[in-house]
């Protein structure tokens, strides 16, 4: 949903500050209301993601490149040669295979053991050897408290909203 040139500039600054210790996880988006807020078509999300990944890869070279008919160069160049590592975040077979086709890693949102197989299978079909997949083994939300009853009164409705709406 973000302009890829502005995003590249912001990521390069973070990459410089972190001296190469950052990773970028991208997503297509999946909530209609977020697309409505940005005046974007939900049906265009895969095409937009593919465009943005291609643009970021070009912009991370530190060279002059053409993006949407504009000749641009992001400076300074990223600390990491070629820019920080990029991954697609998502769940399911379609997302895992898309990450391989984009030539980036895949950060799975759930622990389905088939995800790594789908990603690795698509990488093999494409001859892509530079990627990897991360599949979580545990739940993604953990809250540690010395008084769970008290804290649930404070965070409960927010945690439930997050779980039910995402």
Model regions and ranges:
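Active-site-adjacent structural elements that line small-molecule/cofactor binding pockets in enzymes
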Residues: 1-166
């Amino acid at each position: 949903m973000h302009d890829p040139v502005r995003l590249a500039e912001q990521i390069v600054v973070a990459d410089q500050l972190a001296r190469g210790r950052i990773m970028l996880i991208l997503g297509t988006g999946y909530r209609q209301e977020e697309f409505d807020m940005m005046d974007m078509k939900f049906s265009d999300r895969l095409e937009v993601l593919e465009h943005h990944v291609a643009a970021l890869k070009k912009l991370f070279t530190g060279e002059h490149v053409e993006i949407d008919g504009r000749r641009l160069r992001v400076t300074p160049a990223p600390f990491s040669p070629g820019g920080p590592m990029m991954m697609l975040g998502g769940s399911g077979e379609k997302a895992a295979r898309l990450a391989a086709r984009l030539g980036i890693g895949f950060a799975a949102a759930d622990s389905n053991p088939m995800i790594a197989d789908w990603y690795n299978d698509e990488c093999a079909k494409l001859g892509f050897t530079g990627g990897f997949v991360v599949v979580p083994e545990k739940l993604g939300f953990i809250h540690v408290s010395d008084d769970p009853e008290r804290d649930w009164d404070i965070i409960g409705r927010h945690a439930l909203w997050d779980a039910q709406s995402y």
